[in-house]
């Protein structure tokens, strides 16, 4: 079960939209590994092709994932190896799409206290986010048991298939 997530922080600002996360010019494929190459391409060119993003955590400001409803956006983030997204707030459709594909996301009003390169730890079950670099701890609402099961299964579809198979 994905309970604790730890990784290097990459900071993005407010209103990061789905076109910045995965630009429309790359939507001619649904292959997650192809999408991963262009993750965050219009927000930070070349980000998806960096070697040091595997297992990292994106920390952003308000309204992350706004814009068009595009499941490709959280798929690109997850396929690039990003383990979690922390933001002050999320566009509701992005939030749901991320949960559906098994990408952990966390709303944290103090997200702007993180800096590029900090090491963060997220405990979904107990509702704690830590900035290990600065020695700070923040309380968040823990994931409910149902969402933890979706995360454990790897996404909504995988969860449903598991439930049907049992």
UniProtKB/Swiss-Prot annotation:
Pathway(s) where this gene product acts: Amino-acid biosynthesis; L-leucine biosynthesis; L-leucine from 3-methyl-2-oxobutanoate: step 2/4
Gene Ontology biological process terms, A to Z: L-leucine biosynthetic process
Catalyzed reaction equations: (2R,3S)-3-isopropylmalate = (2S)-2-isopropylmalate
HAMAP family in the cross-refs: LeuD_type2
Keyword Magnesium: no
Family under the similarity heading: Belongs to the LeuD family. LeuD type 2 subfamily.
NCBIfam families membership: leud, LEUD_arch
Pfam entry (one): Aconitase_C
Keywords, alphabetical: Amino-acid biosynthesis, Branched-chain amino acid biosynthesis, Leucine biosynthesis, Lyase
InterPro entries documented for this protein: Aconitase/3IPM_dehydase_swvl (IPR015928), AconitaseA/IPMdHydase_ssu_swvl (IPR000573), IPMI_Swivel (IPR033940), LeuD (IPR050075), LeuD/DmdB_bac (IPR011824), LeuD_type2/HacB/DmdB (IPR011827)
Record's function text: Catalyzes the isomerization between 2-isopropylmalate and 3-isopropylmalate, via the formation of 2-isopropylmaleate.
Gene3D superfamilies xref list: Aconitase, domain 4
Assembly: Heterodimer of LeuC and LeuD.
Record protein name field: 3-isopropylmalate dehydratase small subunit 2
